[in-house]
Amino acid sequence: MPTREELVLERIRDTPEGFVRAYGDVSPGAPRFAGTVLSANHDPDLPWWRIVRADGSLAKGARQRALLDAEGVPFRSDRVDMRIARLP
């Protein structure tokens, strides 16, 4: 049985290019745990930039924005347009 951390990492890896998930989507009921997992992970292939705050705002700023822009993620001002880009 996978650990809680492994489940979070699996959900992050399963987030396809051009879409995002909120911290609470990858760690239901414990969004801060997702942040802890991300900050402790050093896998260069983990698409960390696809995880955003529930309101679409970015935790990592300019670098995260550039990576999401390159994938065609839609924005409304400085936030991801969660109505379009958030996975159900």
List the predicted regions and their residue ranges:
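Nucleic acid-binding interface residues in structured DNA/RNA-binding domains
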Residues: 1-88
